[in-house]
Design a protein with these regions (language model features):
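Phosphate- and other anionic-substrate recognition elements at nucleic-acid/protein interfaces
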Residues: 1-6, 10-155
């Protein structure tokens, strides 16, 4: 099961592909104005997302996305409507409050800080890139919890 999480913003959108256990498979960032191009790529027979990838790889994607999780921030209403028009799978939205802070923690889990950086308090460590994709991963982790709760309550 491949899950796509999206953290839409005014100018750029973070995306993360995760498995059902929440493990990051691939993530990246695209300009929000390029959402049509992103979904065209998603619907292609072998999506690569190469120009947008920041982490991981889509090389071994051999199944379609079965769940989309969207962060419900500032620009999410219009974005969610667009996704509903394009997607053929279940879509859920989650609160994205503080996902940027969680993204910093996730960044340092993937990219262990060097010795000198480790000496700094976590709040003073500055990642070497923007983290919109990892905020989408944080959205995915929240969304998976919500999805499991919904499924459990249906039983």
């Amino acid at each position: 099961m491949i899950i796509l999480a999206l953290d839409p913003g005014r100018n750029k959108t973070g995306f993360a592909f995760v498995d059902f256990d929440g493990r990051l498979l691939a993530s990246g960032i695209f300009l929000t104005d390029e959402r049509e191009k992103f979904f065209d790529e998603l619907e292609s027979s072998s999506p690569k997302f190469l120009s947008w990838l920041k982490e991981g790889s889509t090389e071994n994607f051999n199944e379609p996305v079965s769940l989309i999780i969207i962060g419900n921030g500032t620009t999410s209403d219009e974005f969610s409507l667009y996704v509903q028009e394009r997607a053929s799978c279940e879509i859920i939205s989650v609160d994205e409050k503080n996902t940027t802070l969680e993204a910093r923690e996730l960044y340092w889990k993937i990219h262990r800080p060097g010795l000198i950086t480790r000496l700094l308090p976590e709040g003073l460590r500055v990642p070497k890139r923007t983290l919109d994709d990892l905020a989408a991963w944080a959205v995915a982790l929240r969304g998976l919890k919500k999805y499991r709760d919904i499924r459990r309550n249906r039983l």
